[in-house]
């Protein structure tokens, strides 16, 4: 019986799942929007939101915890230098999931997952 077993297995063993979410979390923090399957996006929320909450208080201990969970120095730097201060006044709900149809090859439901207060697209176009 599967009583009280939380989280999705995603047809992977635990180390593969852990590596998958480390990579997806690093990609989301660096790009602030990524496209992935809907179940992965829903599960990624459970990884990224606690990291951003951790980044709201900048301490050596919190940086080490974030590094232990992501294993990426650039991700930790962006979390604590940019995202922590940006979301300082927001109490949770840092991500948004937007469904975007189905993948052509296998009809898997796809979604964009993004950080809610990311800079507008017009500003990005001006900088390019």
From Swiss-Prot:
Superkingdom field: Bacteria
GO MF annotation terms: structural constituent of ribosome
Alphabetical list of PROSITE patterns matching this protein: RIBOSOMAL_L17
Keywords, in A-Z order: Ribonucleoprotein, Ribosomal protein
Listed Gene3D superfamilies: Ribosomal protein L17
GO biological process, one term: translation
Pfam families in the record: Ribosomal_L17 (PF01196)
GO CC aspect terms: cytosolic large ribosomal subunit
InterPro entries found in the cross-reference section: Ribosomal_bL17, Ribosomal_bL17_CS, Ribosomal_bL17_sf
Family from the record: Belongs to the bacterial ribosomal protein bL17 family.
Subunit structure: Part of the 50S ribosomal subunit. Contacts protein L32.
UniProt-recorded name of the protein: Large ribosomal subunit protein bL17
Chain's gene name: rplQ
């Amino acid at each position: 019986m599967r009583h009280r077993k939380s989280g999705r297995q995603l047809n992977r063993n635990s180390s593969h799942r852990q590596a998958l979410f480390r990579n997806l979390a690093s990609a989301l923090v660096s790009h602030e929007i990524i496209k992935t399957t809907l179940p992965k996006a829903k599960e990624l929320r459970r990884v990224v939101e606690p990291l951003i909450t951790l980044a709201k208080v900048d301490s050596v201990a919190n940086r080490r915890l974030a590094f232990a969970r992501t294993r990426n120095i650039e991700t930790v730097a962006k979390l604590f230098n940019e995202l922590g201060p940006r979301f300082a006044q927001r109490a949770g709900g840092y991500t948004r999931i937007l469904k975007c149809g189905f993948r052509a090859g296998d009809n898997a439901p796809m979604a964009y997952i993004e950080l809610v207060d990311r800079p507008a697209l017009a500003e990005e176009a001006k900088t390019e």
